[in-house]
Amino acid sequence: MNRLCDSMEPKVMDDDMLKLAVGEQGPQEEAGQLAKQEGILFKDVLSLQLDFRNILRIDNLWQFENLRKLQLDNNIIEKIGGLENLTHLVWLDLSFNNIETIEGLDTLVNLEDLSLFNNRISKIDSLDALVKLQVLSLGNNQIDNMMNIVYLRRFQCLRTLSLSGNPISEAEDYKMFICAYLPDLVYLDFRRIDDHTKELAEAKHQYSIDELKHRENLMQVRLQDERARQEELEKHKTAFVEHLNGSFLFDSMYAEDSEGNKLSYLPGVSELLEAYKDKFVIICMNIFEYGLKQQEKRKIELDTFSECVHEAIQENQEQGKRKIAQFEEKHLSSLSAIREESELPNIEKMILECSADVSELFNELMMLEMQLVEQLEETINMFERNIVDMVGLFIENVQSLMAQCRDLENHHHEKLLEISISTLEKIVKGDLDEDLPDDLRALFVDKDTIVNAVGASHDIHLLKIDNREDELVTRINSWCTRLVDKIHKDEIMRNRKRVKEINQYIDHMQSELDNLEYSDILD
C-alpha cells in the first residue's frame, strides 16, 4: 500500500489548516465572503473535507461538536484518534491511509457509514459502540481470518459490506460464508445479494449457524441478566443501601479477619455464628427495605417540587405573553397613527405616550418576575426544609439500626470470649476432648494471647459496621447538599436569563422609538 504522499512532509492538523478547509468548503458568493469576514464557528460546521493533505495524526477536531460528515481519506494517518467529541458524526471516510488497528471510535454512537478501505487492517474489532452502522467498507486490507465475519453479526443495521482485496476474499467459500453468517446483508462488494444465494448459503452452513445462534442466545440471556443486575444495583445505590440486601456486610467483616476465622472452629462457635449471622442479616434487610421506601418518598417529593416550579414558571410566562401581546397590539396601532399624523407637536406627544407604554410594560414584566422569584424562593425553601428533614430522619433511623448491628456484635464478642476462656481453661487442665487446628491451638498459649485475638476480631467487625454507616451518611448528605445547591443555582440562572430577556426586548422597543425620524414620518 504505497502512498504517493509518503515522500512528502507530514502536515499538522492545526487551526490554520482547519480554517482553510472550512473556508474552502463554504459558499463562495457574497454570503460566503461575509461569512469569512465574520468568521465561521467550528461548532456550526456540519461537513469537513480534509483529504489529500498529508495528515499523519488526527487532532484539534474537538470544536467540531456538531459535525455530521468527516472526510480524511488519502492521507498518511497511522492511528485512529482525536474523534472523541464528534458524537454526532454519521459518515466517516478514513480510506487510503496507513491504519493497522481499528480503535478510537467508541464515542461515535451515531455513525452509519464507515470507510476504512485500502489500509493495513488485519482484524475487525473495536466497533461495538457503532450500533447504527449500516455501511462498512474494509476492502483492500490484510484481513485473512473468516471468523472476523462472525464479529459483524452484532451489527443489526449493517446492510452493505465491502471486503474485496483482502486475503479472505480469495477463499472458495467467501461469498457463501458471509451470506450465511450475515443474513441481513443486502450488498457485498458493491453487488446485491440475491435470495437464491442466501438460501444456498443458509443450507450449506445451517448446522454451524444453528450452533452459533444457540451460543449467541445464551450469551444474550447472560447479558440481559447482567444488565438487569446492574440496573438493580444502580437503584440500590441511589437509595444508598447497595449490598445491604443480604449477608454482604457480615461476610465483609470476616473477609479480612484471620483471627475470627480461626476462632470459628472452637466448639460451640459454629452455632453461635449461624445465629449471629441470621439476626445480623435481618437488620441489614430492614435497613435495605427502609432505604428503598425512603428513596421513593424523596423521589415523590422532588417530582412534586419540580412540577410546582414548572407550573409556576409556565403560568408566569403566560401572563407575560398576554401583557406583551396587549402591548404590541396597542404599540402597532400607535405607530400606524404616528405615521398618519402630520402635526409635529402631536407626533411628539404620541411618541412620548409610546415611550411611557414601553416603560409601563417593563415595570409590569419586572413585577411579574419579582412575584415569580418570591414564589419560587418560598417553594424552594419549603422543599429544602422537607428534603433536609427527610434525609435527617433517614440517617437517624439507619444509625439506630446500625446500633443494633453493633449490639449484636458486642453480644457475639462476649459469648466468643466466654467460650475462648473456657476452652483455655480446659486446655490447661487437659480436659479438652475436641481436636483443634494447629493455627487455632497456637492462640491458646496464655490468656492475654486469646483475649487479644478475640479483641482484634471484634475491632475489625466494629470498624466494618462503622465504615458502612459513615459511607451511607456521607453520601446522602453530599447528595442532599448538591441537590439543594443546584436548585438554588438554577433559579439564579433562570432569573438572570429572564431579566436579560426583558431588558433586551424593552431596549429594542425603546430603540425603535428613539430611531424614529420625523422626516420618515412626514414622508
From Swiss-Prot:
Subcellular location field: Cytoplasm, Cytoskeleton, Cilium axoneme; Cell projection, Cilium; Cytoplasm, Cytoskeleton, Flagellum axoneme; Cell projection, Cilium, Flagellum
Annotated coiled-coil segments of the chain: 358-391
SMART domains referenced in this protein's UniProt entry, alphabetically: LRR_SD22
Gene Ontology cellular-component annotations: cytoplasm; cytoskeleton; sperm flagellum
Disulfide bond positions: none
Pfam annotation, one family: LRR_9
InterPro entries found in the cross-reference section: Cilia_flagella_integrity, Leu-rich_rpt, LRR_dom_sf
Keywords: Cell projection, Cilium, Coiled coil, Cytoplasm, Cytoskeleton, Flagellum, Leucine-rich repeat, Repeat
Domain annotation LRRCT: ranges: 166-206
Domain of life according to the entry: Eukaryota
PROSITE patterns: LRR
Placement of LRR repeats on the sequence: 44-65, 66-87, 88-109, 110-131, 132-153
Subunit structure: Component of the nexin-dynein regulatory complex (N-DRC). Interacts with DRC1. Interacts with TCTE1/DRC5. Interacts with DRC7.
Primary role: Component of the nexin-dynein regulatory complex (N-DRC) a key regulator of ciliary/flagellar motility which maintains the alignment and integrity of the distal axoneme and regulates microtubule sliding in motile axonemes.
Entry similarity comment: Belongs to the DRC3 family.
UniProt name for this protein: Dynein regulatory complex subunit 3
